[in-house]
């Protein structure tokens, strides 16, 4: 998953924030995951003009492998990570103890969320 933004008026600030280049991309069309199945997400922050981006998962926790270069998680049982520009990592989690339904994920900066960086997993 690519976390990025767009400076649409060339003023040196992002007016749109997104994952995989589309604002609110998975809000109307959630990412479907099977209950109990391991989800492994490769995330990279390629945001320009903002030094830090983040990922926050509602109602769940994940293990995080910073830079994706270790065999053991760098962080265990977290619900939010921060990434600097060009930083990458791997998230692993399941929804085995959750009811089917929708679970939000988004940046943990209010401005980013309001301008497009908010999406949903749909557990089936």
Name every feature range the model reports, one short phrase each:
Residues 1-124:
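Copper-binding active sites and cupredoxin-like electron-transfer domains
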